Amino acid sequence: MKILGIDPGSRNCGYAIIEKNVRKTALIEAGLIKIKPNTLQYQITELCEGLDVIFKNHKFDEVAIEDIFFAYNPKTVLKLAQFRGALSLKILQLHGDFAEYTPLQVKKAVTGKAKAQKEQVAFMVKKILGITKEIKPLDITDAIAVALTHANNLCLR
């Protein structure tokens, strides 16, 4: 089963593709959709075009995204919500249904602690997948964690 995990953001959107079977889980690809500083419309277009490339190169059984976190700055929340809306629409157009997880759910699923730091999530992601090299930036490890969370939830169904 091929799962796409996405960690949306207004500067970078992390993505990860994992393959899960009965015996093991493997990381197929992970990276960033880099969003350059520009008008919001242009940034949303960049995000959607980045997703087009990912979906053109891969077929997925499942897609999961991390829900936006609470931010104190109302402008940040509005911008993230607009990115999230565009991302949701694009996934629905390209794939159909997708799963959503809060940051706390992802952290708890991967580390056992809902309040874990991003570095702890990165450490556990590497440990779970048997990866020795460093994965940077943390947007990528967050996306891998989203995919792993969804893979684990599918096993529980």
Curated annotation (Swiss-Prot):
Mg(2+) 1 binds at D7, D139. It comes from the Bacteria. GO terms for molecular function: crossover junction DNA endonuclease activity; DNA binding; magnesium ion binding. The keyword Ribosomal protein does not apply. The keyword Electron transport does not apply. Keywords: Cytoplasm, DNA damage, DNA recombination, DNA repair, DNA-binding, Endonuclease, Hydrolase, Magnesium, Metal-binding, Nuclease. Mg(2+) 2 binds at E66. Pfam families: RuvC (PF02075). SUPFAM superfamilies: Ribonuclease H-like. It catalyses: Endonucleolytic cleavage at a junction such as a reciprocal single-stranded crossover between two homologous DNA duplexes (Holliday junction). GO terms for cellular component: cytoplasm; Holliday junction resolvase complex. Binds 2 Mg(2+) ion per subunit. Its EC number is 3.1.21.10. It is an enzyme of class 3 (hydrolase). Its cofactor is Mg(2+). GO terms for biological process: DNA recombination; DNA repair. The active site is at D7, E66, D139. It is found in: Cytoplasm. NCBIfam families: ruvC. Belongs to the RuvC family. Homodimer which binds Holliday junction (HJ) DNA. The HJ becomes 2-fold symmetrical on binding to RuvC with unstacked arms; it has a different conformation from HJ DNA in complex with RuvA. In the full resolvosome a probable DNA-RuvA(4)-RuvB(12)-RuvC(2) complex forms which resolves the HJ. The RuvA-RuvB-RuvC complex processes Holliday junction (HJ) DNA during genetic recombination and DNA repair. Endonuclease that resolves HJ intermediates. Cleaves cruciform DNA by making single-stranded nicks across the HJ at symmetrical positions within the homologous arms, yielding a 5'-phosphate and a 3'-hydroxyl group; requires a central core of homology in the junction. The consensus cleavage sequence is 5'-(A/T)TT(C/G)-3'. Cleavage occurs on the 3'-side of the TT dinucleotide at the point of strand exchange. This is Crossover junction endodeoxyribonuclease RuvC. It comes from Campylobacter curvus (strain 525.92). The gene is ruvC.
